[in-house]
Design a protein with these regions (language model features):
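Helix-to-beta-strand junctions that scaffold the AdoMet/dcAdoMet cofactor pocket
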Residues: 173-174
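Class I SAM-dependent methyltransferase Rossmann-like catalytic core
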Residues: 46, 51-75, 79
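A short acidic, Gly/Pro-enriched loop at the edge of an enzyme's catalytic core
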Residues: 145-156
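Conserved Class I S-adenosyl-L-methionine
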Residues: 2-3, 193-213, 221-274
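Class I SAM-dependent methyltransferase SAM/SAH-binding core
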Residues: 89-91, 97-146
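N-terminal auxiliary segments of SAM/dcSAM-dependent transferases
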Residues: 1-49
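Conserved beta-strand signature within the Rossmann-like core of class I S-adenosyl-L-methionine
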Residues: 177-184
């Protein structure tokens, strides 16, 4: 059965068998027991273990499973539902541990649609966690800058907090298809930042036009969450870039908290390929 994936070596279609993906040229990629394939050639890795590690994967899964970001998930589901035909092809690029990918897939199926979805991430531990969530999605370890996808293959591309690979997104998205780019809003985790830093500053908010895409809308998502225990606070901290660049004193202040109430703020930028 022909899959959504293309061979990362020669670009030919990959057929999915019971245990491996294979292309007509004979290149073969085993399917791990969790259900994902490794489609990241050595020349695209740039490090021995690219992307987030196993601890980061566990922190994300634990935090997101408690519903703290469900408002963002539900808003994404509504937007993608309104943009989708009966059998949409959707790629979640830099999908992380698959929280949004799986939620969107299940929403579309529940609405009577027949989505074909792929989730890719450069981190093997993160992708392994994602593949356990939903067997109906095609999962692969792959670079966002070298997607194992055919030209014009996707109706919708989703990028949540991952690096932009605009040239590749233009290649993979069909004309008229939609690209959803999720970024933190100005006040995202403001109260967390007040604990970590002496002089926190809001995230920049701007509309950036991208060549080959028309801006369609920006959807704001705003909420306040309360983390009732240090374990959840630490899990959230691990999910953020602040985990790697916070002064020791700020990290110690956060570790001393027994609870934290903080704003969450997101922007969903919606583009359409020209």
């Amino acid at each position: 059965m022909e899959s959504l994936f293309r061979c990362p070596v020669c670009g030919a279609p990959l057929d999915r068998g019971d245990r491996a993906y294979r292309c007509p040229a004979g290149h073969s990629y085993d399917i791990a027991r969790e259900g994902y394939a490794y489609l990241l050639p050595p020349n695209q890795k740039h490090s021995a273990a690219p992307g987030d590690d196993r601890d980061m994967a566990a922190a994300r899964r634990e935090f997101l499973s408690k519903g703290y970001y469900d408002l963002l998930l539900n808003t994404l589901c509504c937007q993608i539902l309104s943009l989708s035909g009966e059998s949409p092809v959707i790629w979640d690029v830099g999908c992380g541990e698959g929280f949004y990918t799986s939620g969107i897939f299940r929403t579309l199926v529940a609405a009577g649609k027949s989505p074909r979805m792929a989730g890719t991430d450069i981190s093997k531990p993160i992708l392994r966690s994602a593949a356990k969530r939903e067997k109906g999605i095609a999962w692969a370890v792959a670079s966002s800058f070298h997607l194992p996808a055919a030209d014009g293959a996707a109706d919708i591309l989703l990028d949540c907090f991952s690096p932009l690979a605009l040239e590749e997104f233009r290649r993979v998205l069909r004309p008229g298809g939609h690209f959803l780019y999720v970024v933190p809003g100005p006040d995202h985790l403001w109260e967390l930042k007040q604990v970590l830093y002496d002089r926190p500053y809001p995230n920049e908010e701007k509309e950036t036009p991208y060549e080959g895409f028309a801006y369609r809308s920006i959807v704001p998502v705003e909420d306040t969450i309360t983390l009732p225990c240090q374990a959840d606070i630490h899990a959230l901290f691990q999910m953020t870039p602040y985990y790697w660049k916070t002064p020791k004193a700020g990290a110690e202040r956060l570790a001393a908290l027994e609870s934290l109430t903080t704003r969450i703020s997101f922007r969903i930028h919606i583009f359409q390929k020209l």
